[in-house]
């Protein structure tokens, strides 16, 4: 199970899992608390012994695997919005990985959240706002902002904005891991079948 392709596909599913929740919040104004918690929890696992340590909620990750099948499979379920968010996240991740200053600030701010979690649940509004602040201060300054589509009435609400930014930070965490595990954008074109087959196997494990 610790084969590189399984680990890479797990991290890629983690990106899409978070992006799927971004869409849900942007369109409906709220996220499933368990899914939100699962996504945000990945940010806090900074020194994992294995990739599976990062994604401890298998049910939540299965939604990510399903999106892998939808986006890279041969059926007609591809979502151009998901693709656009994915491209934006991967572009920002490249800039992040090249900036030791940004990476250092990110680690420092995540440590602050660790302390906050002694007093609050990870889905508490104050914690979510903190994650959102990390994304705004460190990630979104690295390059073009990701334009989020959704219901304008919800997108105006500060808590909705916080959840979306917090989930984008979770997507970024998985993108960093995916790259560390050898993931490259060209794999999404030339190794599509392998990734899809691996996602299918992972869904049944």
UniProtKB/Swiss-Prot annotation:
Keywords: Cell inner membrane, Cell membrane, Cytoplasm, Membrane. It is found in: Cytoplasm; Cell inner membrane. It holds the Pfam family DUF489. Gene3D superfamilies: HflD-like. One of its GO terms (cellular component) is plasma membrane. It is a peripheral membrane protein. This is High frequency lysogenization protein HflD homolog. It comes from Shewanella loihica (strain ATCC BAA-1088 / PV-4).
